[in-house]
């Protein structure tokens, strides 16, 4: 999915507002995903999935760090996320549908925390961005 110049501007501005809360929002999105889509828990059998667990918080930070990397390399996400794509395709073997589920939960989390910034245009741009990240992360499944 191609991001327009306006999409890129919206994504960078929105992620800039996330700032130091990125890890917190990443963990919250994971918790939302586990609660809303319980089958996603199967990829984390060794995690304490309770609210506020250190493992979920640490993984939420990893998710947020990957998104920060993608935002910073929005014009070259395949290169920037190549190692992460390899990890998810070859080692973790995460079902690609789970990226869509997490993307949805990230959008809900961002809308809850940034209601003034979460305009329809920003929502659409973030949705396209997360779809692009998902496409990159699943590109090596083929």
From Swiss-Prot:
Where Phosphotyrosine occurs, residue numbers? 25
Gene Ontology process terms (BP):
hydrogen peroxide catabolic process
According to its UniProt record, in which tissues is this protein expressed?
Answer: Red blood cells.
- Top-level taxonomic group: Eukaryota
PANTHER family in the record, alphabetically?
HEMOGLOBIN FAMILY MEMBER, HEMOGLOBIN SUBUNIT ALPHA
Q: What does this protein do?
A: Involved in oxygen transport from the lung to the various peripheral tissues.
Would you tell me the protein name for this molecule?
Answer: Hemoglobin subunit alpha
């Amino acid at each position: 999915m191609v991001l327009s110049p306006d999409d890129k501007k919206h994504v960078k501005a929105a992620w800039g507002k996330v700032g130091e809360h990125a890890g917190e929002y990443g963990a919250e999105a994971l918790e939302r995903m586990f609660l809303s889509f319980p089958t996603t828990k199967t990829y984390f059998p060794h995690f304490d999935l309770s609210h506020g667990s250190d493992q979920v918080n640490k993984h939420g930070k990893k998710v947020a760090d990957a998104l920060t990397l993608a935002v910073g390399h929005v014009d070259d996400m395949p290169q920037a996320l190549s190692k992460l794509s390899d990890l998810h395709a070859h080692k973790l073997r995460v079902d690609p549908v789970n990226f869509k589920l997490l993307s949805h939960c990230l959008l809900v989390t961002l809308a809850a925390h940034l209601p003034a910034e979460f305009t329809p245009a920003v929502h659409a741009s973030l949705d396209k961005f997360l779809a692009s990240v998902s496409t990159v992360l699943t590109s090596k499944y083929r």
